[in-house]
Amino acid sequence: MEKGKVVLAYSGGLDTSVEIAWLKNKGYDVIACCIDVGEGKDLEAIKEKGLKVGAVESIVIDAKHEFAEEYVLPALQGHAYYENKYPLVSALSRPLIVKKLVEVAKEHGATAIAHGCTGKGNDQVRFEVGIHALVPEMKIEDPIRDLHWSREEEIEYAKENGIPVPISKKSPYSIDENLWGRANECGILEDPWQSAPADAYDRTVALEDTPDTPDVIEITFDKGVPTKLDGEELPLEELIMKLDKLAGKHGIGRIDHVENRLVGIKSREVYECPAATVLLAAHKDMEDLTHERDLAHFKPIIEQKLSELIYNGLWFSPLMDAIQAFLAETQKVVNGVVRVKLFKGNVICEGRKSPNSLYSEELATYTSADQFDQEAAAGFIKLWGLPTQVYAEVMQQNEKNNK
């Protein structure tokens, strides 16, 4: 029975290739859609494979620039670390992928969108909540979750439908990567006591193999946007890719994390985020120089909520819109240059300057050039401590009265 068109989030792997056949057999015309957010895959080969295994159309969308400008940048400016450790690699790309799938579905008049997420991960939530936030009436198909196939059953179905089955040894890991980093799980990593083996890493060098000489770089920010690396102006996605290689060489950005998944279980993940680690540290350093105290102390509260919204698949929500408006306001003064040393896994911000700097050497110095009015301190201290002083006096008087 004809069911119309379905847009499939297609990766080129066995899972989503099998999905093409399954959806086709169910009566759909399948449009395979691969969104490039910086994975480094052979996109032309993926496009051709989609057609070969039965899609009526196979589309590849280069979304690296949009990913950097519209998704990575707010996460950078909002210092988005889930559980104060994970800079949201996979979670950050999902809303953009959802947005592109919806755009393709509307353009082609599709009646459904399909993905290949398992029933115990976070991505099923991110995809489906995101899709319905943009198109509430859209039908969603998820054969991988709904069929509960074993690997053997999946391979058998692939053979029956003429889908090429990988003959090489399957990697024990489940890997997802983009501009902002690389996420790795499964295999030996499922035992949180076991150290991640060398083959679990790809973007970073082991500390014992890193150079014995540091690299010192300068990152320029314009309204919170990193615009230059060592004086060279670059589009954000290119700056990230260039910095990723440089920082990875020094073993920067390895994160071994047991995190709380949205679906209620704990999961051990190994992340590599060289560029993200450096940029987040440098951006925070520039904010420390340019943000007034109350703003500096309040912003982390918003940052925590931002990271939770991204992780939990609520990018397309009123609260996210409000948080992004807040972040935009905070970035107006985040202008200047941060000097950073990269060495043996460490990111050391060792210099910073800004036309919006709130640091006054004349007020901070302990030399004869000091302009701080120390005589004002006594009155300030008296008024600042007055509430606690009054409280103590009342408590003492009550104790005397009760004797």
UniProtKB/Swiss-Prot annotation:
<feature type="binding site">
    <location>
        <position position="122"/>
    </location>
    <ligand>
        <name>L-aspartate</name>
    </ligand>
</feature>
<feature type="binding site">
    <location>
        <begin position="9"/>
        <end position="17"/>
    </location>
    <ligand>
        <name>ATP</name>
    </ligand>
</feature>
<dbReference type="GO" id="GO:0004055">
    <property type="term" value="F:argininosuccinate synthase activity"/>
</dbReference>
<keyword id="KW-0067">ATP-binding</keyword>
<keyword id="KW-0963">Cytoplasm</keyword>
<dbReference type="GO" id="GO:0000050">
    <property type="term" value="P:urea cycle"/>
</dbReference>
<dbReference type="GO" id="GO:0005737">
    <property type="term" value="C:cytoplasm"/>
</dbReference>
<comment type="subunit">
    <text>Homotetramer.</text>
</comment>
<dbReference type="GO" id="GO:0000053">
    <property type="term" value="P:argininosuccinate metabolic process"/>
</dbReference>
<dbReference type="Pfam" id="PF00764">
    <property type="entry name" value="Arginosuc_synth"/>
</dbReference>
<feature type="binding site">
    <location>
        <position position="126"/>
    </location>
    <ligand>
        <name>L-citrulline</name>
    </ligand>
</feature>
<dbReference type="InterPro" id="IPR001518">
    <property type="entry name" value="Arginosuc_synth"/>
</dbReference>
<dbReference type="InterPro" id="IPR014729">
    <property type="entry name" value="Rossmann-like_a/b/a_fold"/>
</dbReference>
<feature type="binding site">
    <location>
        <position position="122"/>
    </location>
    <ligand>
        <name>L-citrulline</name>
    </ligand>
</feature>
<dbReference type="InterPro" id="IPR023434">
    <property type="entry name" value="Arginosuc_synth_type_1_subfam"/>
</dbReference>
<feature type="binding site">
    <location>
        <position position="271"/>
    </location>
    <ligand>
        <name>L-citrulline</name>
    </ligand>
</feature>
<feature type="binding site">
    <location>
        <position position="118"/>
    </location>
    <ligand>
        <name>L-aspartate</name>
    </ligand>
</feature>
<keyword id="KW-0436">Ligase</keyword>
<comment type="pathway">
    <text>Amino-acid biosynthesis; L-arginine biosynthesis; L-arginine from L-ornithine and carbamoyl phosphate: step 2/3.</text>
</comment>
<keyword id="KW-0055">Arginine biosynthesis</keyword>
<feature type="binding site">
    <location>
        <position position="116"/>
    </location>
    <ligand>
        <name>ATP</name>
    </ligand>
</feature>
<dbReference type="InterPro" id="IPR048267">
    <property type="entry name" value="Arginosuc_syn_N"/>
</dbReference>
<protein>
    <recommendedName>
        <fullName>Argininosuccinate synthase</fullName>
        <ecNumber>6.3.4.5</ecNumber>
    </recommendedName>
</protein>
<dbReference type="InterPro" id="IPR018223">
    <property type="entry name" value="Arginosuc_synth_CS"/>
</dbReference>
<dbReference type="Pfam" id="PF20979">
    <property type="entry name" value="Arginosuc_syn_C"/>
</dbReference>
<keyword id="KW-0028">Amino-acid biosynthesis</keyword>
<feature type="binding site">
    <location>
        <position position="123"/>
    </location>
    <ligand>
        <name>L-aspartate</name>
    </ligand>
</feature>
<keyword id="KW-0547">Nucleotide-binding</keyword>
<feature type="binding site">
    <location>
        <position position="86"/>
    </location>
    <ligand>
        <name>L-citrulline</name>
    </ligand>
</feature>
<dbReference type="GO" id="GO:0005524">
    <property type="term" value="F:ATP binding"/>
</dbReference>
<dbReference type="InterPro" id="IPR048268">
    <property type="entry name" value="Arginosuc_syn_C"/>
</dbReference>
<feature type="binding site">
    <location>
        <position position="259"/>
    </location>
    <ligand>
        <name>L-citrulline</name>
    </ligand>
</feature>
<dbReference type="GO" id="GO:0006526">
    <property type="term" value="P:L-arginine biosynthetic process"/>
</dbReference>
<comment type="similarity">
    <text>Belongs to the argininosuccinate synthase family. Type 1 subfamily.</text>
</comment>
<dbReference type="InterPro" id="IPR024074">
    <property type="entry name" value="AS_cat/multimer_dom_body"/>
</dbReference>
<feature type="binding site">
    <location>
        <position position="174"/>
    </location>
    <ligand>
        <name>L-citrulline</name>
    </ligand>
</feature>
